[in-house]
Amino acid sequence: MKKLLLLLVCGMIFTGCGAEQTVETVADEPVVQVLAEPREIYVALPDDSVLPAMESDSGTVYFCKDYDISIQTMESGDLRKTVKSVSGYSPEELTVMETAVSDYVRYDFVWSAAGELGQQVCRACVLDDGNYHYALAVMGNADTAGEYGEIWSGILESFCLV
């Protein structure tokens, strides 16, 4: 009787010890990370800018007299990828200035490159709110860029999240 009682107690102890195996099936739906909606941006466009010349879900290009303005929205996370996408250069090849603004971070940088119409000068700004990168780039011919320095500064300084 003692043996039977001992076997019964041991059986009760060891029956709950097996680890439950988790099995994933084809019908399981993957967990998708949902990003917040992109925020609204504000930029003071100059009077000589025409209506958007090209527009897509992620960006807009405006043509002005001697320069172009492009605005893009990209997923946040990889600043290196965003800077490379905007400028064609990695952040290590540029001087990227970081400024903390109330609820986002601002990155400013400048570069020049040879274009079809000669040497091009470009200034850009990327705003990072943690969910998206909002990029503004102003580019024009190096010969006439000096004439528009004040206008370009005004455009870039006005670029912010609302």
Which residue stretches match the model-derived regions?
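Conserved polar/disulfide-associated segments of primarily extracytoplasmic proteins
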Residues: 53-144
